[in-house]
Amino acid sequence: MALHLLLLFGACWVQVASPDSLQRTTMLPSTPHITAPSTSEAQNASPSVSVGSGTVDSKETISPWGQTTIPVSLTPLETTELSSLETSAGASMSTPVPEPTASQEVSSKTSALLPEPSNVASDPPVTAANPVTDGPAANPVTDGTAASTSISKGTSAPPTTVTTSSNETSGPSVATTVSSKTSGPPVTTATGSLGPSSEMHGLPATTATSSVESSSVARGTSVSSRKTSTTSTQDPITTRSPSQESSGMLLVPMLIALVVVLALVALLLLWRQRQKRRTGALTLSGGGKRNGVVDAWAGPARVPDEEATTTSGAGGNKGSEVLETEGSGQRPTLTTFFSRRKSRQGSLVLEELKPGSGPNLKGEEEPLVGSEDEAVETPTSDGPQAKDEAAPQSL
């Protein structure tokens, strides 16, 4: 908090002190000859105003904390004025003052150090900043040179840092480090121009630019590293996607092939079952035909025997009917279950007729011998078939 308050106080002091310095810089060039101030006046002005360019016009370039340049085209009058001012400043603050002959070289290439005051007091540090502006008679001074001074009188409070800037667009920034006998760290004052400067002078400016460049480079590298990481993560995805697509493309035809094969197998099984059912019906029908043929052959053979035994005494008409039945029985290819049923129906009809023909049984028993004789005579005409028919009768 103390540092912030001191900074605010210093800024206000700079704003208050700047119009005074402007008045002094504008009033001094009007007098061609300036006498050196006495030591008492310098001592009275030193606590309130910074030593150096505060009481000198814009032509003065020697300041304890600034590095400025003076062109070589100075007149002897100006050098004498500068030397007189230097002697007055040296008498007030006990600073080493260069000789008038070496003032040009010192002002052009060297920077003055902060004087170390011998008096130690408990007063707070006084910090003042003097922005340099271009006046009407500021011909030999380089434009845009800002110098700031800070005088510390050996206090125990932490030192402060004051930064002043000039509104000029050209000129280097001056930064000086002041070593004091206080217990705190050294005080650093830096001044910089608000506008762009053609040449960068001073370590703070170079370090600031280098820090900006390093931060930009670091950000660039971080962005590039992120890009590489994203590309590295995208590569496996691109390599995995074809495998997944290929596996999916392979699975689909496999499933389709399995479905088709299962459908074909089901159709084949159904067709085979139908074939088996059809062949089973044919075999059963064929077996029935064969069995039916045998049964039908046996049936008609028996029916004519019964009819022959029952109708032999009735006359020749019945015998002719028996022959017709025998003739029909000799054709086994035409016999079926239906014909067999007919034969059974005929046998049932004959059985029903037997009880009704009871009185004729005695008459029928007598001609049986004659019927047998006829049956014996018939083999001669019919051949071996008649013998086969005669065998069951004898049995």
Curated annotation (Swiss-Prot):
Consequence recorded when altering S347D: No loss of phosphorylation or localization to the uropodium. Loss of interaction with EZR
Signal peptide positions (record): 1-19
Modified residues (Phosphoserine): S285, S328, S339, S343, S347, S371
An example Gene Ontology molecular-function term: transmembrane signaling receptor activity
Membrane-side (Cytoplasmic) residue stretches: 272-395
Required for interaction with EZR, MSN and RDX and for co-localization to microvilli, as annotated region: 272-302
InterPro entries: Leukosialin (IPR038829)
Tissue: Cell surface of thymocytes, T-lymphocytes, neutrophils, plasma cells and myelomas.
Protein name: Leukosialin
Organism: Mus musculus
Gene: Spn
